[in-house]
């Protein structure tokens, strides 16, 4: 379904599971888990079907960021972290969601970090999964070289330094398999993802180049879980450790996954979902 969030913008939203469930002589309200996808330029498909296993704990709201996937096209002037972060609040207002648990994967984690800075009292909990706080080019290049040798480093250097359709296509064909340490459980999953390269190239060539999200993390006013695969080349371990250290000590939690790449639930779903279930239920 498409939800109006103001000023003519509509987001594609999919909801899994009831929010109210029978519990003896009463109806119990489950928390709402909002899942924000990576990219930018991709859609929410990567969360499905894996995240369905959390539907017993929380009502799950998947959505495509403004301009992405099945959401309405929007002008490039709206393709900014501030706008995408504010859209979380707009979407919650439209759906009547209060105190959500907000999960941001990769680029979705950039959005979640900006959301923490701009709306520190809005969430009940935040999960920052496989994300970074800056470009961190040299770390990326070193990580890709460790995983795939000099050729992988060169492909990463070309795309992240000079983003274009040509450099992205070469990069994606040459290093996408290095993002994770295990083969995809579903080889057809990538084909289900809707991709908008215009948004990807706009962001990587613009706001991403000078990205700096650490300072805003001191605004956190709720528990924040940082999840990181220790062998993630695109959002390296060091970035996650710096994100964790920038959060207020009373709110921060860290989950490291050895031998795991980008998106811990892909490479070690048993461990990753155990951590998520514990954090959601706390």
Predicted regions and their residues:
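Flexible "cap/lid" loop of the alpha/beta hydrolase fold
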Residues: 125-158
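Catalytic histidine-centered segment of alpha/beta-hydrolase-like enzymes
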Residues: 260-269, 273
């Amino acid at each position: 379904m498409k939800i109006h969030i103001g000023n003519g913008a509509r987001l594609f939203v999919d909801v899994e599971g009831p929010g109210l469930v029978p519990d003896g002589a009463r109806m119990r309200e489950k928390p709402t888990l909002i899942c924000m996808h990576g990219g930018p330029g991709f859609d929410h498909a990567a969360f499905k079907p894996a995240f369905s296993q959390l539907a017993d704990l929380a009502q799950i709201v998947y959505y495509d960021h403004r301009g992405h996937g099945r959401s309405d096209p929007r002008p490039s002037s709206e393709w900014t972290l501030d706008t995408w972060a504010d859209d979380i609040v707009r979407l919650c207002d439209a759906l009547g969601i209060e105190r959500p648990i907000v999960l941001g994967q990769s680029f979705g984690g950039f959005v979640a970090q900006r959301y923490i800075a701009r709306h520190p009292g809005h969430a009940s909990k935040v999960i920052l999964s496989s994300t970074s706080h800056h470009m961190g080019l040299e770390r990326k290049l070193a990580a890709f070289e460790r995983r795939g040798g000099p050729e992988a480093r060169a492909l990463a250097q070309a795309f992240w330094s000079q983003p274009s359709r040509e450099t992205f296509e070469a990069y994606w064909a040459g290093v996408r398999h290095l993002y994770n340490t295990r083969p995809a459980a579903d080889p057809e999953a990538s084909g289900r993802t809707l991709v908008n390269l215009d948004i990807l190239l706009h962001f990587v060539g613009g706001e991403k180049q000078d990205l700096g999200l650490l300072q805003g993390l001191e605004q956190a006013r709720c528990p924040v879980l940082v999840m990181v695969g220790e062998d993630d080349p695109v959002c390296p371990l060091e970035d996650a450790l710096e994100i964790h250290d920038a959060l207020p000590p009373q709110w921060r939690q860290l989950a490291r996954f050895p031998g795991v790449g980008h998106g811990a639930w892909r490479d070690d779903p048993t461990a990753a979902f155990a951590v998520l279930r514990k954090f959601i239920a706390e």
